A protein has these predicted regions:
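N-terminal secretory signal peptides that target proteins for export/translocation
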Residues: 1-14
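Intrinsic structural disorder/low-complexity segments
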Residues: 5-7, 18, 152
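Secondary-structure junction/capping motif
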Residues: 15-17, 114
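Bacterial N-terminal signal peptides
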Residues: 17-32
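Flexible, solvent-exposed loop/hinge segments and secondary-structure transition points
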Residues: 36-176
Length: 176
């Protein structure tokens, strides 16, 4: 410490002591904050549809489409409705199928039910459902549920609504 000849502390020494006491106080106060930050944060986990399984589902749907025969578009989406894969067969029936298939899959995910169920609701007790913006209420969309968890959806658009539904069901048979 700096002392004057008279034995008294200089102003610089008093200032340094004051600063040191503030630093010690801040450090002592921050110890609980550091301890609180060190605790792990629990984040929710969710089931996801792996790409390899999406491919297997699509392959089964393609095989069914070829067996009918009914070429078209098959789309697989994740649980947020984002496309994982989309396949347009060589002789797809309609150009609109490239838009319909992923929208059917997305609608099945967002409503957590078959689009055949949605189509029946629109045709029957819930005609106002058709006003839901951005959804396709046509057969051919199915949610993909594994171990009770919604992980995605499949959407099919080929030549007829019944074929759409049959092909989507064939894809789902992979996980049942």
């Amino acid at each position: 410490m700096h002392q004057h000849r008279s034995g008294k502390l200089t102003r610089r020494t008093r200032h340094m002591s004051f600063v040191a006491s503030i630093v010690v106080a801040v450090m002592a106060a921050s110890v609980p904050l550091v301890a609180a930050q060190a605790a792990p944060i629990e984040l929710p986990t969710r089931a996801v549809l792996p790409f390899a399984l999406a491919q297997k589902i699509a392959d089964a749907a393609i095989q069914k489409a070829k067996a009918i025969p009914a070429d078209g578009v098959i789309a697989i989406v994740d649980d947020a409705g984002e496309v994982i894969l989309q396949i347009r067969m060589d002789n797809a029936f309609m150009r609109a199928s490239s838009r319909l298939a992923p929208e059917k899959a997305r609608s099945a995910v967002m409503f957590h039910r078959s689009t055949a169920t949605l189509e029946a609701a629109v045709a029957g007790p819930r005609p106002a459902l058709v006003t839901a913006p951005g959804f396709v209420m046509l057969k051919g969309g199915e949610p993909i549920v594994i171990n009770g968890h919604l992980v995605g959806g499949i959407g099919v658009s080929v030549d007829t609504p019944d074929h759409d539904e049959d092909i989507a069901q064939a894809g789902l048979a992979v996980i049942k």
